[in-house]
Amino acid sequence: MDLERGDKKPPPPPPPAPRTAAATTTTTTTPACSGKKRPPLRDSLVALQPVLLRAAAALAAAAAAAVMALDAQSYTAVVAIVGTRPLTQTFTAKFSDTPAFVYFVIANAIAAAYNLLVLLVRRRRRTTAGLVVRMLDMVVMALLATGAAAAASMAELGRNGNARARWNPVCDRFGSFCRRGGAALAASFVGVALMLALNLLSAASGAGC
């Protein structure tokens, strides 16, 4: 017999431990752009882009306001002849005669002053609210666009006239006035394009990393 021989049966193996729920591991995902580091040269170039755009926009707006504000031309015409003596009258064209041109000068002057002020504030490293600056950039861009559009409509009327309303063109008599006004309009539209680029760059930098 086994008991008599001193042999003992091995104890049965212990029952398997109940399976516990697998521990959930939480992994934190970091944005893909947080690990990317741009080189210092690229960072400096990216930081320099808004400054260059703003400076160019201020220069374009200031040039447009100055050229339009100084735009004036006189034209002398014979209106009657008394005997052998002609009677002449001098006509003068200047920007203050047209409300659209006055608005154009004011809008461009405001845009130039605003951009210069923002550049000076950033140069002195004072704290400025970025959201406020972005909103003001959009307001100034809209102001520039409306001023340029209003002046362009009046410039087209002065160049081609309106046959139905019997408004004769005036650029055939005030050619220099119209040419300088056209140069001011071109500078203003350049300022609008630069402000648009500045707003797009600001939106891209705010949405990106």
Curated annotation (Swiss-Prot):
Homodimer and heterodimers. It is found in: Cell membrane. PANTHER family: CASP-LIKE PROTEIN 1U1. This is CASP-like protein 1B1. Residues 71-100, 156-180 are extracellular. Residues 1-49, 122-134, 202-209 are cytoplasmic. It is a multi-pass membrane protein.
